[in-house]
Curated annotation (Swiss-Prot):
The keyword Magnesium does not apply. Quinone reductase that provides resistance to thiol-specific stress caused by electrophilic quinones. Also exhibits azoreductase activity. Catalyzes the reductive cleavage of the azo bond in aromatic azo compounds to the corresponding amines. The gene is azoR. GO terms for molecular function: electron transfer activity; FMN binding; oxidoreductase activity, acting on NAD(P)H as acceptor; oxidoreductase activity, acting on NAD(P)H, quinone or similar compound as acceptor. Belongs to the azoreductase type 1 family. HAMAP family: Azoreductase_type1 (MF_01216). This is FMN-dependent NADH:quinone oxidoreductase. It comes from the Bacteria. InterPro entries: Flavodoxin_fold, Flavoprotein-like_sf, FMN-dep_NADH:Q_OxRdtase_AzoR1, NADH:quinone_OxRdtase_FMN_depd. It comes from Salmonella arizonae (strain ATCC BAA-731 / CDC346-86 / RSK2980). Keywords: Flavoprotein, FMN, NAD, Oxidoreductase.
Length: 201
């Protein structure tokens, strides 16, 4: 039995293309892997705090006492990291907003990137500590960006996930959503076919 963590980040709720793909992924995964456990965390509906000058102090070990706000942030960071480490498959819904991931998803990454916890520095360089995971990224875009300089999502996620130890990453794209109903429908259809392949793998 595997445990699947699904991270939603779209601010568009029911109108979200990435949300629809995520729901389809969950539906297909449950159908093909009946015994698996799925956890859904909606980072838009329940956002995590922005890492600011005060909160960053909570993420770095020190002798100074933590403020109540820092204590809350550290507890949340611990919770998010424990949740991440407890799951085998990480599904990341990452719609493209202004060429990159949503703020809500970036805030999540900022809270789980902790030296000595999810990665560490060694004489040979940084080493990821979140290993043995598989990640699936579902990314919807209004335009066509895959394999072009305007796609900042795929390179960033490969680097970040690899940095914390997750190197098995599959991408599913739904592109050209804003190009009209026909293009959008084909994008969704192609993305669902790609999801079917990922789920069956």
């Amino acid at each position: 039995m595997s445990k699947v963590l699904v991270l939603k980040s779209s601010i568009l709720a029911g109108y979200s293309q990435s949300g629809q793909l995520t729901d389809y992924f969950i539906e297909q995964w449950r159908e093909k892997h009946v015994a698996d456990e799925i956890t859904v965390r909606d980072l838009a509906a329940n956002p995590v705090p922005v890492l600011d000058g005060e909160l960053v102090g909570a993420m770095r070990p020190g002798d100074a006492p933590l403020t109540p706000r820092q204590q809350d942030a550290l507890a949340l960071s611990d919770e998010l990291i424990a949740e991440l480490k407890a799951h085998d498959v990480i599904v990341i819904a990452a719609p493209m907003y202004n060429f990159n991931i949503p703020t809500q998803l970036k805030n999540y990454f900022d809270l789980i990137a902790r030296a000595g916890v999810t990665f560490r520095y060694t004489e040979k360089g940084p080493e990821g500590l979140v290993t043995g995971k598989r990640a699936v990224v579902l990314s919807s875009r209004g335009g066509i960006h895959k394999d072009t300089p305007t796609d900042l999502i795929a390179p960033y996620l490969k680097v970040f996930l690899g940095f914390i130890g997750i190197t098995d990453v599959n991408f599913v794209f739904a592109e050209g959503i804003a190009y009209g109903p026909e293009v959008a429908a084909k994008a969704q259809s192609d993305a669902k076919a790609a999801i079917d392949s990922v789920v069956a793998a």
